[in-house]
């Protein structure tokens, strides 16, 4: 686990944890910061970037995700955030192993990139498109992730769509984490080094 990889892995998991925090906020309050989505959404359409930071609009919002990870690593107490992160990690792994579904995902993201030439990423049309991509090309890779929250919010189509979009962003961030050599074993066996990398992040 090189120092460079530790930095990239820490940043990618911070992004994933922020997306998961937004899932929880949407499910329990019906809203999440627009800035979070603005930062995360470009990663769905960007490929082969020179730096991990270049996949995102900005990384400043990821500080909250970093704080959640640091708290978990220090206190060792599981939380709803960690449970969702584990499920998203398994989902990303199964998705990557399913060649047909993964190919479908890439095709639909390419189509979304074309649509993004006409609409801002936060436009309702793009949110609906990304939500549909998650539902059709990601979620089927494993048993559905059960979202706990206020049913009055979760039954609203616009909020449910944003929950799916945040899950899609979390899956993408986990995929980037793996691309930079991330694995659950490294988090377990190099816990102190990973914690150091998280604390060294500058936003």
Curated annotation (Swiss-Prot):
Claim: Membrane is one of the keywords in the record: yes
Membrane topology type: Peripheral membrane protein
Keywords linked to the UniProt accession: Cell inner membrane, Cell membrane, Cytoplasm, Membrane
Cell membrane as UniProt keyword: yes
Database matches in Pfam families: DUF489
Compartment(s): Cytoplasm; Cell inner membrane
InterPro entries: HflD, HflD-like_sf
Record-level GO cellular component terms: cytoplasm; plasma membrane
SUPFAM superfamilies in alphabetical order: YcfC-like
Source taxon at top rank: Bacteria
The family this protein is said to belong to: Belongs to the HflD family.
PANTHER family, sorted: HIGH FREQUENCY LYSOGENIZATION PROTEIN HFLD
The protein, known as: High frequency lysogenization protein HflD homolog
Organism whose genome encodes this protein: Dichelobacter nodosus (strain VCS1703A)
């Amino acid at each position: 686990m090189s120092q460079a990889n530790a930095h990239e892995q820490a940043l990618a998991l911070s992004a994933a944890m922020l997306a998961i925090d937004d899932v929880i906020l949407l499910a329990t309050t019906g809203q999440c910061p627009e800035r979070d989505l603005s930062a995360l959404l470009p990663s769905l359409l960007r490929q082969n970037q020179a730096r991990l930071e270049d996949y995102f609009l900005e990384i400043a919002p990821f500080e909250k995700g970093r704080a959640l990870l640091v708290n978990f690593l220090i206190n060792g107490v599981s939380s709803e955030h960690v449970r969702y992160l584990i499920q998203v990690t398994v989902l990303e792994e199964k998705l990557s192993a399913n060649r047909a579904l993964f190919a479908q995902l890439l095709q639909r993201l390419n189509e979304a990139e074309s649509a993004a030439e006409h609409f801002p990423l936060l436009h309702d049309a793009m949110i609906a498109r990304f939500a549909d991509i998650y539902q059709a090309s990601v979620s089927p890779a494993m048993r559905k992730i059960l979202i706990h929250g206020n049913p009055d919010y979760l039954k609203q189509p616009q909020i449910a769509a944003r929950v799916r979009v945040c899950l899609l962003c979390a899956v993408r961030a986990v995929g980037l984490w793996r691309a930079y050599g991330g694995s659950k074993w490294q988090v377990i066996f190099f816990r102190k080094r990973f914690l150091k990398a998280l604390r060294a992040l500058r936003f």
